[in-house]
Regions:
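N-terminal organellar transit peptides
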Residues: 1-92, 99-204
Length: 204
């Protein structure tokens, strides 16, 4: 057994042969976060070998270059993966969401898709154009978008940087299956009041 304090991304203690292992990506996508995540993700796939790896995502995005290696690690995992947007999957964070065998999201979570950019580089810069096509390929192959649709979403409304997508819209677009939207449960006080009201209504 490994103590959870030994890890930055793996959640809880893990034991060889666990049913489900959970690992989080709660960070911007950069050289440190991706290399650290991949080290621990590979530890799960090569040593722990659980039946499933659950990847929790809350990320504002970041580097396409570094993010694609993390996308590939999740995508190519021999162990089934489940990516869950628990808050925000923006920019490269949305690419990580697309890597899982199954993608889920909280009903309050958000996805944001836009065109890549870099300081000092225009939209017609060869590197930016190449990164744009790379990301489009991911969205088209993983989520079934055609060229016109993904261009519309990544461009966003006039004057905006891309498109913000809530859970309802994600279902409409086919990004998330309706059954994979995780509902927010009411607080305990509300549950008790609802139960009391139900009993009272039945007694009338």
């Amino acid at each position: 057994m490994e103590n959870k304090n030994n890890f930055k991304f793996i959640q809880g203690s893990v034991t060889v042969g666990d049913d489900i292992a959970t690992i989080k990506f709660f960070d911007s996508v950069d050289a440190w976060s991706t290399s650290s995540f991949e080290y621990e993700f590979n530890y799960l796939t090569e040593y722990i070998k659980p039946s499933k790896i659950r990847v929790l995502i809350n990320s504002d995005g970041g580097s396409v270059y570094h993010g694609m290696s993390t996308f590939s690690s999740i995508l190519d995992s021999k162990i089934p993966t489940e990516t869950i947007n628990v808050g925000l999957a923006a920019s490269m964070g949305s690419v990580l969401l697309a890597a899982g065998d199954v993608a889920k999201m909280k009903d309050y979570a958000l996805i944001m898709l836009h065109n890549p950019w870099s300081r000092g580089a225009g939209s017609d810069d060869p590197m930016i154009l190449a990164f744009t096509e790379q990301i489009k390929t991911v969205y088209k192959e993983r989520w079934g978008f055609d060229e016109d649709k993904i261009k519309e979403i990544m461009d966003g409304p006039e004057g905006e940087d891309g498109t913000w997508i809530n859970a309802k819209r994600a279902v409409e677009l086919g990004i998330i299956d309706e059954s994979n939207v995780i509902k927010t449960e009411p607080q305990e006080k509300q549950k008790v009041e609802a139960a009391i009201n139900s009993v009272e209504s039945k007694s009338k």
